[in-house]
Regions:
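Acidic, glycine/proline-rich low-complexity segments that act as flexible tails and inter-domain linkers
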Residues: 1-48, 101-122
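Iron-sulfur (Fe-S) cluster-binding segments and ferredoxin-like electron-carrier domains
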Residues: 29, 68-82, 106
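Alpha-helix C-capping/helix-to-loop hinge sites
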Residues: 37-41, 55, 90-93
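Alpha-helical scaffolds flanking conserved acidic
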Residues: 46-51, 80-86
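C-terminal structural segments of small proteins and small subunits
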Residues: 84-109
């Protein structure tokens, strides 16, 4: 059983973007131009771009992005194995980012010395 009716959700997202486009056409037009410009590059094919988009989508926790880019990745011929590998990279990088930020937390803790400063003090 699926967590969500992704096809219906993708249609709902498209309808929502259509509504935003009516209210702020330049914003949506700018987004569309940015997306179109990216699609014109020749360094990566559509499948790789869509797998990258999905890796970013899970990092940003964007269900709409997942719905749209999963459909596009499938159209571009992505396999479940390729999807797993791309998402594995995102999982690894996100875990790595948490690890790096953990070092900043320890730095903050140590920099405060024996006793934390009072509120409003540095």
């Amino acid at each position: 059983m699926s967590m969500l009716d992704w096809n219906t959700y993708r249609k709902q997202v498209a309808a929502g973007v259509g509504e935003i486009s009516k209210l702020s056409p330049d914003t949506v037009r700018g987004y569309a131009q940015l997306s179109a410009a990216n699609a014109k590059t020749t360094h990566f094919d559509a499948k790789i771009r869509e797998l990258m988009a999905l890796a970013v989508a899970i990092s940003l926790r964007c269900d709409g992005c997942i719905a749209v880019h999963t459909a596009e990745a499938k159209k571009a011929g992505a396999t479940e194995g390729e999807l797993a590998e791309a998402l594995g990279v995102a999982i690894s990088v996100n875990a790595g980012a948490a690890l790096v930020y953990a070092t900043r937390t320890f730095d903050s803790f140590k920099a405060m010395g024996e006793k934390a400063p009072e509120a409003g003090q540095s």
